[in-house]
C-alpha cells in the first residue's frame, strides 16, 4: 500500500509498522493530535515507539487545545529535535479572540433535577443545533429519553454505546436530522461538527479544561456561538468560567421545532459498488426528488445514510416502493427516533 496520509491511534500505527503495511522511507511528518490526551490515556510508550521507527522523519508536530506544562523527554531526545530543536507555536491569542465570539450565560434551575429547565432552554433555541454536555453515561440516556418524550429530536453519544450507534447519532446531528446531541465529554474533543450554535452545560464542567473543550464545539473559525450553564439551587458557578449574564427561562414554554430533515437508511454501500452519485440519481429519477430535497449522504461499506427533506419523505417512499438501487434489491427505510 502507498498511502499519502495515514490516520491511526498510536497503538494502531505501531501495528501497521510491525506488519510493514507501508514503507517508512518517505514519511517526513508525524502529527500527534490531542497530544496531552494521549499522555493522559497512557499512550506514552506507543508514541515513543512510533517516533523511533520513522527514520526519515523531519517534522514532529504535537497539538493540544490547552497549554502543556512540559514536553516528555523522549520528544526532546528524538533525532528531529536534535537537528531542529523544539519550538512552541502558541495560538492562545486566537483562542482569546474566539472567546470574544462566545456569549456565556447562566440559566438558573429552580429544582435540583434540571430536566424541565433544559426543555425550556432548548425550546427557546427554536430548533438550532445544540450540544448538551453531562457528566455520566447514565445521565445521557436518561436526559435523551426525557427529551424524546417531550417531542425533541435528540440523540445520545457516549463511550458505552456501540460504535455503529455512535456514528449514526453523529450523522443525524451533522446532517440536521436531529437538533440536540446529549453527550458526555467524549464529544468535547476530536469531532468535526460544523455550525453548532449552542453549547449547554447540564452538569457543571469538572475543571477549566473541560469547560474550554466543551465550549469549543461552538464559535469555531469566524462563527459566533452561545454557551449556557444550567445552575441548580445548590450549585455555584466555578470561578474559571468568569463573568456570565443570567438568562431566566421561566416564561411560557414553546413547542419544540422539528428538524427539516429525516434520515433514510439504504442497505447497500461501498462493497456493493454504490456511491453518492448513484444514490442521488436514484432518489431523483425514481423517487421524484430534486437535488435540493437531498442533504448529506454518507456511504459506509455495507450501508448508506441519506438526509431527506422531511416534507418529501412520504412521496419518496411511495415512489420507490419495490424499486432496485443500481439493479440491486435492498432495504430502504427511514430511521425512527
Residue map of PLM features:
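Conserved helix/coil segment N-terminal to the catalytic DExD/H
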Residues: 1-29, 37, 44-52, 166-175, ...
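Walker B catalytic acidic pair
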Residues: 10, 33-35, 136, 195, ...
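Non-catalytic terminal extensions of ATP-dependent helicases
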Residues: 250-337
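Conserved interdomain hinge at the start of the Helicase C-terminal
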Residues: 100-148, 288, 292
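Post-DEXD/H (motif II) to motif III coupling segment of the RecA-like Helicase ATP-binding lobe
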Residues: 15, 21-95, 235, 240-243
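Conserved helicase ATPase core of P-loop NTP-dependent helicases/translocases
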Residues: 140-146, 152-184
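A short beta-strand element within the Helicase C-terminal
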Residues: 180, 189-204, 226-230
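Conserved segment of the helicase C-terminal RecA-like domain
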Residues: 180, 207-249
Amino acid at each position: 500500500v502507498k498511502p499519502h496520509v495515514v490516520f491511526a491511534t498510536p497503538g494502531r500505527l505501531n501495528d501497521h509498522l510491525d506488519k510493514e503495511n507501508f514503507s517508512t522511507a518517505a514519511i517526513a511528518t508525524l502529527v500527534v493530535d490531542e497530544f496531552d490526551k494521549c499522555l493522559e490515556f497512557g499512550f506514552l510508550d506507543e508514541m515513543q515507539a512510533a517516533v523511533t521507527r520513522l527514520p526519515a522523519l523531519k517534522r514532529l508536530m504535537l497539538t493540544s487545545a490547552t497549554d502543556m506544562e512540559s514536553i516528555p523527554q523522549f520528544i526532546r531526545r528524538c533525532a528531529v529535535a536534535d537537528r531542529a530543536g523544539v519550538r512552541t507555536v502558541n495560538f492562545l491569542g486566537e483562542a482569546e479572540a474566539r472567546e470574544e465570539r462566545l456569549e456565556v450565560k447562566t440559566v438558573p434551575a429552580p429544582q435540583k433535577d434540571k430536566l424541565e429547565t433544559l426543555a425550556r432552554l432548548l425550546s427557546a433555541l427554536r430548533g438550532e443545533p445544540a450540544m448538551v454536555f453531562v457528566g455520566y453515561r447514565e445521565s445521557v440516556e436518561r436526559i435523551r429519553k426525557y427529551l424524546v418524550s417531550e417531542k425533541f429530536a435528540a440523540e445520545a453519544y457516549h463511550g458505552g454505546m456501540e460504535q455503529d450507534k455512535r456514528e449514526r447519532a453523529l450523522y443525524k446531528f451533522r446532517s440536521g436530522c436531529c437538533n440536540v446531541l446529549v453527550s458526555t465529554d467524549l464529544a468535547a474533543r476530536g469531532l468535526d461538527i460544523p455550525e453548532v450554535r449552542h453549547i449547554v452545560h447540564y452538569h457543571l464542567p469538572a475543571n477549566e479544561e473541560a469547560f474550554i473543550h466543551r465550549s469549543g464545539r461552538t464559535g469555531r473559525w469566524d462563527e459566533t456561538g452561545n454557551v449556557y450553564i444550567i445552575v441548580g439551587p445548590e450549585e455555584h458557578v466555578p470561578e474559571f468560567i468568569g463573568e456570565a449574564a443570567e438568562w431566566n427561562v421561566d416564561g411560557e414554554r414553546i413547542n419544540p421545532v422539528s428538524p427539516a430533515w429525516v434520515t433514510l437508511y439504504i442497505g447497500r454501500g461501498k462493497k456493493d459498488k454504490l456511491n453518492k452519485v448513484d444514490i442521488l440519481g436514484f432518489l431523483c429519477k425514481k423517487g421524484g426528488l430534486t437535488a435540493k430535497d437531498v442533504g448529506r449522504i454518507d456511504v459506509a461499506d455495507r450501508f448508506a445514510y441519506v438526509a431527506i427533506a422531511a416534507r418529501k419523505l412520504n412521496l419518496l417512499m411511495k415512489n420507490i416502493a419495490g424499486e432496485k438501487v443500481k439493479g440491486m434489491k435492498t432495504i430502504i427505510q427511514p430511521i425512527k427516533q
